[in-house]
Amino acid sequence: MIPVTEFRQFSEQQPAFRVLKPWWDVFTDYLSVAMLMIGVFGCTLQVMQDKIICLPKRVQPAQNHSSVPNVSQAVISTTPLPPPKPSPTNPATVEMKGLKTDLDLQQYSFINQMCYERALHWYAKYFPYLVLIHTLVFMLCSNFWFKFPGSSSKIEHFISILGKCFDSPWTTRALSEVSGEDSEEKDNRKNNMNRSGTIQSGPEGNLVRSQSLKSIPEKFVVDKSAAGALDKKEGEQAKALFEKVKKFRLHVEEGDILYAMYVRQTVLKVIKFLIIIAYNSALVSKVQFTVDCNVDIQDMTGYKNFSCNHTMAHLFSKLSFCYLCFVSIYGLTCLYTLYWLFYRSLREYSFEYVRQETGIDDIPDVKNDFAFMLHMIDQYDPLYSKRFAVFLSEVSENKLKQLNLNNEWTPDKLRQKLQTNAHNRLELPLIMLSGLPDTVFEITELQSLKLEIIKNVMIPATIAQLDNLQELCLHQCSVKIHSAALSFLKENLKVLSVKFDDMRELPPWMYGLRNLEELYLVGSLSHDISKNVTLESLRDLKSLKILSIKSNVSKIPQAVVDVSSHLQKMCVHNDGTKLVMLNNLKKMTNLTELELVHCDLERIPHAVFSLLSLQELDLKENNLKSIEEIVSFQHLRKLTVLKLWYNSIAYIPEHIKKLTSLERLFFSHNKVEVLPSHLFLCNKIRYLDLSYNDIRFIPPEIGVLQSLQYFSITCNKVESLPDELYFCKKLKTLKIGKNSLSVLSPKIGNLLFLSYLDIKGNHFEVLPPELGDCRALKRAGLVVEDALFETLPSDVREQMKAD
C-alpha cells in the first residue's frame, strides 16, 4: 500500500494559517483527502493485483457436406484443432476434460500484457492515476497562496500580529477605558448614532458590513481591576504592536496580490472541475468487466483472438462514480466561493458595527489586501477582527501612550523638575513628551504649567485639582480641552503664553478666558506665510491687561482694538518686519506700557503721542536715526521710562529737557557722540544708560542728577570724568569700563552707596585708596584687572574681600 501521509507535503501548512481558511476551504480540504484516498487505493490495486486475465477463444471451422475435409478450409481455420484422442478402452469410465490450449505460463503473461496495452481503454488503465493527479492539483491550488513568497510573507506577518493583538492585555484595558468614558462623550455618541439612523432609513449603509459582525453582537464586560493591571512591560509591548499595525497597514493596503491570487486559484479549480466532469462523464462507461482482445500474436501463441477479464473493472466503475460525486460537490463549493468573491465587496472592510459595539469611534475602514484578510478571518471567528480593531484606533493608542506616560512620570519624579519662573511662580516644565501625564494633576502646589513641543495634548477635567494654577505656557503644542477643564481655566487662569507655528497650535478656547490678565502670543500672523492664522475677537477677555505679540505683522491686529479700553501693556516684537499702520494705537487710551521692538521704525510713531496715560515706551532694535519728534513727549506727563536703545541715533536733541518726569533713560547701542547739557535738566533721572556709543565728553551738569542711582558709559571714548559726577550721592552702580580713562578721582570715596563699579578696560595705573570709603563696595562688585586691584592698600583689599 502507498501511505496517504506521503502526500501530506502537498497540503501541509502552518497551524496558524487556519484563521484564513473559511468553511468552504476546510470542506474542500476534506473532499480532497477523500479523493486522494480513492486515487491511492486505486493505484495500490493497480500495482499489487493482476490488471487483466485473458484466455484464447476457440473458433470452430466451417462444416462441408463432403466426408473429406477441405484442405484449404483447414488451413484457413483461425485456431488449430487439437489432435484427435483415442477413445477410452473402458466405455464405463467417464473422464472430465477441459479445453486445452497448450500454452505455458509465460505465454499467458505475454498475452495478458499485450491485451492490457492494446485492448484495454486508456481511461480504465489510468483512472486511479488521473484521480491522484487531479486531487494533488486541487490541493496545490488551494494552498498555493500560503506558499508563494509574495503572499505568504504578508500572511505570516499578519497572523503573527493578529495573534499578539488578540492575546494582548491592552485589548481588554482599552475596552475598559471606553466603558468608563465620561457621560458627555457618551451622550454625544448617542446623538450622532440617532442622527445617522434617521438619515439611513434602510438597513444598509454606504459602507460594507461584515455578515458575521452583524450576526454576533458581542458585549464586552470588563473587570476593572483586571483591566487596570497593565504593567510597564505589557504597555511597551502594546506600544510596539501599534507601530507594527501601522506599518503593516500602510504596506498591505498598497496592493491586492492576496485577493487576486485567491480569485485566480479558485477560478483555476472551477475550470479543472468542469474539465474533470466533462471527460469523466463521457468515459466512465469505458470501464468494462469483459474486454475482447484481437492481437496478432498467432506466431508466438497460436491464437490471435482472446477474451479478457478486467479484474478491477467493477471496483473502478464504482470508484469513478464516487469520484464524480466528490468532484461535483467540490466544484459546487468552488462556484459558491466565486459567488462570494465577486458578489461581496471584499476590497473594502468596514468596522461600523465594531465602532457601535465597542464605542471606539475612530477605528478606520481598510481596503485591498488588508480588507480581504479581515473578511477571511470573519469567516473563521469575528472576534479576531474586533480585538484587532483596537490597535487601529488612534484613541486607543493615545490612551496607551497616556498609561505608559503615567507609569514613567510619577508624581515624585515630576516634583524634582519644579522650579521658580520669571514671574516668581512655582513652574513645572515638560518638554517633548508624548502627552500630558495625568500625574501632573496630583501636584496641587503647582502654580505654572509649561508644555513645549507636545502634540495632541488633552487637558482633562482633573486639572481642577490644581487650585493654585494661574499660568499656562503652550509652546508648539496642539491642545484640546475638556469642557469641565475649560470652565476651571476661565475662572482661575491669569497668564497664558502660546507659541505656535500653525493654526492647530493656536487654541480656539483661549478667546473665552474671561479672567485672563496676561496673554503672550509668539508665532506667524502674516498673511503671506500663513493665511489661515488670524486672531479672532478678544472682546470676551474682559480682564486682559497685558498683551504681547511676537510675530511679523504689518499693522496692529484689529482684534486688539476689542480690549483697548482696559489694556494696560502692549508689546509688539516684529522680527524686523516693518510695522506700517499704527492708527489702532490711538484707541488704547489706558495704555501705560508700550513696546515696539524690531519693527523697522524710522521715526517715532505719531500715534504714541496720543497715549496720555503712557508711562513706559520701548523702541528697541528699530531703525531710528533722528528723534526730533521727542518734543511731543512733553504732553505725556506720566512718561517715566524711555528706551531708545539698539538704534542708529546720532544725537540727542535739546528738546529732551522737556521730559521732566523722565526717571529711566536707555540710550545704549547707538551712535551718539555728544551729550547735550540739556539732558541733565531731567533731574528726576535715576537710571541712565549711555553705553556702547561714541561719547568723548561728559558735561559737568551731570551733577544735577541727585537721584541718579545707575550710570553706564561702558564702551565709549571718554578720557576723563567730571568731578561733579561724584556729587550724585545716591549712585549705586557705576560702569565706566572700556574707555580711555587714565585717572580715577579720589572723590569716588564720596559715593557711600556704591556697590558695583566697573572700571576694567581703561588705562589706570593705580587705584585711589579712597575706594575704601565706599563701604558697600565688595570685591565681587568691583570689576577690575587683578594686577590693578593689588595697587590698593592691603587693608582696603581685606575690607572688600570680607563678607
Swiss-Prot record:
<dbReference type="GO" id="GO:0015734">
    <property type="term" value="P:taurine transmembrane transport"/>
</dbReference>
<dbReference type="GO" id="GO:0015810">
    <property type="term" value="P:aspartate transmembrane transport"/>
</dbReference>
<feature type="repeat" description="LRR 7">
    <location>
        <begin position="541"/>
        <end position="563"/>
    </location>
</feature>
<feature type="topological domain" description="Extracellular">
    <location>
        <begin position="49"/>
        <end position="124"/>
    </location>
</feature>
<dbReference type="InterPro" id="IPR050216">
    <property type="entry name" value="LRR_domain-containing"/>
</dbReference>
<feature type="repeat" description="LRR 11">
    <location>
        <begin position="637"/>
        <end position="659"/>
    </location>
</feature>
<keyword id="KW-0472">Membrane</keyword>
<feature type="repeat" description="LRR 6">
    <location>
        <begin position="515"/>
        <end position="537"/>
    </location>
</feature>
<keyword id="KW-0406">Ion transport</keyword>
<dbReference type="Pfam" id="PF12534">
    <property type="entry name" value="Pannexin_like"/>
</dbReference>
<dbReference type="GO" id="GO:0034702">
    <property type="term" value="C:monoatomic ion channel complex"/>
</dbReference>
<feature type="disulfide bond">
    <location>
        <begin position="115"/>
        <end position="293"/>
    </location>
</feature>
<feature type="repeat" description="LRR 10">
    <location>
        <begin position="613"/>
        <end position="635"/>
    </location>
</feature>
<keyword id="KW-1015">Disulfide bond</keyword>
<dbReference type="GO" id="GO:0071470">
    <property type="term" value="P:cellular response to osmotic stress"/>
</dbReference>
<feature type="topological domain" description="Cytoplasmic">
    <location>
        <begin position="340"/>
        <end position="803"/>
    </location>
</feature>
<dbReference type="GO" id="GO:0005225">
    <property type="term" value="F:volume-sensitive anion channel activity"/>
</dbReference>
<feature type="repeat" description="LRR 5">
    <location>
        <begin position="490"/>
        <end position="513"/>
    </location>
</feature>
<feature type="repeat" description="LRR 9">
    <location>
        <begin position="588"/>
        <end position="611"/>
    </location>
</feature>
<feature type="repeat" description="LRR 2">
    <location>
        <begin position="421"/>
        <end position="443"/>
    </location>
</feature>
<dbReference type="GO" id="GO:0034214">
    <property type="term" value="P:protein hexamerization"/>
</dbReference>
<keyword id="KW-0597">Phosphoprotein</keyword>
<feature type="repeat" description="LRR 4">
    <location>
        <begin position="467"/>
        <end position="488"/>
    </location>
</feature>
<feature type="topological domain" description="Cytoplasmic">
    <location>
        <begin position="145"/>
        <end position="262"/>
    </location>
</feature>
<keyword id="KW-0813">Transport</keyword>
<keyword id="KW-0812">Transmembrane</keyword>
<feature type="repeat" description="LRR 1">
    <location>
        <begin position="409"/>
        <end position="420"/>
    </location>
</feature>
<protein>
    <recommendedName>
        <fullName>Volume-regulated anion channel subunit LRRC8C</fullName>
    </recommendedName>
</protein>
<feature type="modified residue" description="Phosphoserine">
    <location>
        <position position="215"/>
    </location>
</feature>
<dbReference type="InterPro" id="IPR003591">
    <property type="entry name" value="Leu-rich_rpt_typical-subtyp"/>
</dbReference>
<keyword id="KW-0256">Endoplasmic reticulum</keyword>
<feature type="topological domain" description="Cytoplasmic">
    <location>
        <begin position="1"/>
        <end position="22"/>
    </location>
</feature>
<keyword id="KW-0677">Repeat</keyword>
<feature type="modified residue" description="Phosphoserine">
    <location>
        <position position="212"/>
    </location>
</feature>
<dbReference type="InterPro" id="IPR032675">
    <property type="entry name" value="LRR_dom_sf"/>
</dbReference>
<feature type="region of interest" description="Disordered">
    <location>
        <begin position="177"/>
        <end position="206"/>
    </location>
</feature>
<dbReference type="GO" id="GO:0005783">
    <property type="term" value="C:endoplasmic reticulum"/>
</dbReference>
<feature type="repeat" description="LRR 8">
    <location>
        <begin position="566"/>
        <end position="586"/>
    </location>
</feature>
<dbReference type="GO" id="GO:0140361">
    <property type="term" value="P:cyclic-GMP-AMP transmembrane import across plasma membrane"/>
</dbReference>
<dbReference type="Pfam" id="PF13855">
    <property type="entry name" value="LRR_8"/>
</dbReference>
<dbReference type="GO" id="GO:0045444">
    <property type="term" value="P:fat cell differentiation"/>
</dbReference>
<feature type="transmembrane region" description="Helical; Name=3">
    <location>
        <begin position="263"/>
        <end position="284"/>
    </location>
</feature>
